[in-house]
Amino acid sequence: QDPDTLDTWFSSALWPFSTLGWPNENAEDYNYFYPTNTLVTGYDIIGFWVSRMIFSGLAYTGKAPFDTVLIHGIVRDSQGRKMSKSLGNGIDPLEVIEQYGADALRMMLIIGSTAGNDMRYSDEKVLACRNFANKLWNASRFVQMNLPEDFEPGLPAEDLLDMSDKWILSELAKVAAEATANLDKYELGLAAEKVENFIWEVYCDWYIEICKTRLNGEDAAAADAARKVLVYVLDKALKLLHPFMPFITEEIYQALPGSAETIMNEKWPGDENMKVWAEDCADFEKLMDYIKAVRAMRAEMNVHPAKKTSMVIETASPAAFEKGGAYLARFAFATDVTVTAKYEGSTDGMVNVATPDAKGFIPMMELIDRDKELARLNKELTKAEKELGMFTNQLNNPKFVEKAPAKLVEETRAKLAAAQDKAAKIKES
């Protein structure tokens, strides 16, 4: 052994302070950067490197080089194997970036990571993140195409906000607070996933679609309010997403009215005191649940969107459905809506659509082939009753309940409850 050679891990252990001018403890870089806050590294080198940095720092400077260590897992291949030259299962990041984009690869790695756990790489996961980037890009283009040249950003007065505006602003406040809390706990994957879900499922799939009614309507004030909220929420969403997808967020941000020199210097939305309208949110979510149920029922019965019909809604929350008439017309394909606390009229030829907060009576039989629909329902009922019998027999068997894994028993009970619910709904309809 060469006495003048320092083992690689021991030389690496000196890195936190030896690169900053040490042993000159008056060096500017040393005083500014040492000690630092957080070290991010893999679990495979805790003993080799992390522990050596800590005891070397304490021994030579009297201070630990960092106060927090965030341990992440290893990126493995789609089969869970460690990537190696011998297996030939490694990836070239530059090739992935060329095909899917740097943001997509970055987002996939962040969403797939949980502290200390390994993750599996696959092109399909990167493709899903690229699809999200495309969704965001197209949504942003839609917003920009609907802005007049003299558009002034900023939220409208509260009395100009409708139920959907208050809902999206409240959801924005919630996701900003949740993502901030996740980041404070180093839960990057959870934070990124929540921001992605907000942008895709809440902003794109619901709010943008809802805004089209006002943007294409005759009420200029309502259209302007929708534009202002669209831009405001997009601006904040881009800032929330920026740490995870920096390139596309900067590009879109620069195209927004009133943007600064760079999104990187903008204030983090989670630090703002954004308002939540709890009552309006609850009302709007009741409306959304009902619309989803109607659309699912129509899809199941193969009813074309062009075929619209009247509906009666029985509910203890009439305000939500009375305020949402325009949304029911557009998204639940209603020609007219009657809201009542108790429906006592004829249900002949009607289909029931039930949610926790409402029951809809819809004359669907006039839009479909009655005999064909009855045959479909009977087939579904037979299947549900068969499942009912199978799960009931399993749970009535003492040997199964006693010897099967507890998780399997719970899953069987859940399947039985689902089959019971399905059979009851079919009979009710």
Predicted regions, residues:
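Aromatic-rich carbohydrate-recognition surfaces in CAZymes
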Residues: 46, 96-98, 104-110
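Feature 926 captures the class I aminoacyl-tRNA synthetase adenylation module centered on the KMSKS loop
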Residues: 1-10, 14, 59-98, 102, ...
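Short, solvent-exposed helix-loop connector elements
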Residues: 117-125
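Alpha-helical support elements that line or immediately flank enzyme active sites
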Residues: 47, 52-60, 195
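Reverse-transcriptase-like RNA-dependent polymerase core
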Residues: 15, 19-23
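Short glycine/proline-rich turn/loop motifs
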Residues: 29-36, 117-118, 272-276
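The substrate-binding groove and active-site-proximal loops of carbohydrate-active enzymes
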Residues: 35-45
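A glycine-rich, basic-preceded beta-loop-alpha segment at the flavin cofactor/substrate interface
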Residues: 110-111, 175
